[in-house]
């Protein structure tokens, strides 16, 4: 994979010269990088020795693919006979699929679920009508509920529940240095938004309507500690407000009200019956 990375890095430096007319090793390298992302053999970010590391070259490969591929008429559905048409550069992950491909994939995708090619969907995932963008990674056992958006290159862990209308931010526009990450066993409440490379630590629970960006203050109500850019593992988080000491308007914040306990887990546990 080192040779592939070298090819992508060189192409990135010469990106102004790359277009839909480009052929040869650059196109081959980008196509291979997207294949690796799609299959899950590679991912834009991974945890190494307990810390998240972003493979910037894979993100660059995703961006280069937009220069290499022209817009074309697209239709969705098995063997291209579904709904549409659309005018886009990135094909649907499921284009040309029939029963054997879905059985090998091992996940469930209901009508209205859209996944772009270059995104990976793990075993036992359920995709309700939702959108998973290119470079995204959804790990095993996760529920992607109705109207969820998983942004470009976002990383979703194992056994996560993304409730209805949740938005997980991408990296492509506006351009972000690192992807948004939801670690294993998290529950993200309905209509919540997590964006701009924020990391939600393992086992955390966000209530309905929590909004966290890279600049949002995440306040621990018990200790007064303020976190920026990361929700500590096993936190229970609700929307809050920081009052202005001078009597002016308060500012939005997220508040850690407690750590996850047995009662919280019972309310947010995944339903194995849905994954049989």
Swiss-Prot record:
Coiled coil: none annotated. Substrate binds at residues 108, 145. It is found in: Cytoplasm. GO terms for biological process: diaminopimelate biosynthetic process; lysine biosynthetic process via diaminopimelate. Keywords: Acyltransferase, Amino-acid biosynthesis, Cytoplasm, Diaminopimelate biosynthesis, Lysine biosynthesis, Repeat, Transferase. One of its GO terms (molecular function) is nucleotidyltransferase activity. GO terms for cellular component: cytoplasm. It comes from the Bacteria. Its main location: cytoplasm. Pathway: Amino-acid biosynthesis; L-lysine biosynthesis via DAP pathway; LL-2,6-diaminopimelate from (S)-tetrahydrodipicolinate (succinylase route): step 1/3. Its EC number is 2.3.1.117. PROSITE patterns: HEXAPEP_TRANSFERASES. Signal peptide: none annotated. It catalyses: (S)-2,3,4,5-tetrahydrodipicolinate + succinyl-CoA + H2O = (S)-2-succinylamino-6-oxoheptanedioate + CoA. It is an enzyme of class 2 (transferase). Pfam families: Hexapep_2, THDPS_N_2. Homotrimer. Belongs to the transferase hexapeptide repeat family. This is 2,3,4,5-tetrahydropyridine-2,6-dicarboxylate N-succinyltransferase. The gene is dapD.
């Amino acid at each position: 994979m080192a040779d592939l990375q070298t090819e992508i890095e060189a192409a990135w430096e010469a990106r102004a010269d790359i277009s839909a007319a480009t052929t040869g090793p650059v196109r081959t390298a980008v196509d291979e990088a997207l294949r690796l992302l799609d299959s899950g053999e590679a991912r834009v970010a991974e945890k190494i020795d307990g810390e998240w590391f972003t493979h910037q070259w894979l993100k660059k490969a995703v961006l280069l693919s937009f220069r290499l591929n022209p817009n074309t008429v697209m239709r969705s559905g098995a063997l291209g006979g579904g709904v549409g048409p659309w005018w886009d550069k990135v094909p649907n992950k499921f284009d040309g699929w029939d029963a054997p491909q879905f059985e090998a994939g091992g996940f469930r995708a209901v009508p209205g679920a859209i996944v772009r090619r270059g995104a990976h969907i793990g075993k036992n995932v359920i995709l309700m009508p939702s959108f998973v963008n290119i470079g995204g990674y959804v790990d095993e056992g996760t529920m992607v509920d109705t109207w969820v958006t998983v942004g470009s290159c976002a990383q979703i862990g194992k056994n996560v529940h993304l409730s209805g209308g949740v938005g997980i931010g991408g990296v492509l526009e506006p351009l972000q240095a690192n992807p948004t990450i939801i670690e294993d066993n998290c529950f993200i409440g309905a209509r919540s938004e997590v964006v701009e490379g924020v990391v939600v630590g393992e086992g955390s629970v966000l209530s309905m309507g929590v909004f966290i960006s890279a600049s949002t203050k995440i306040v621990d109500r018990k200790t007064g500690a303020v976190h920026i850019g990361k929700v500590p593992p096993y936190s229970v988080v609700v929307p809050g407000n920081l009052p202005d000491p001078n009597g002016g308007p308060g500012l939005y914040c997220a508040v850690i009200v407690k750590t996850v306990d047995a009662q919280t887990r019972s309310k947010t546990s995944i339903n194995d019956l849905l994954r049989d």
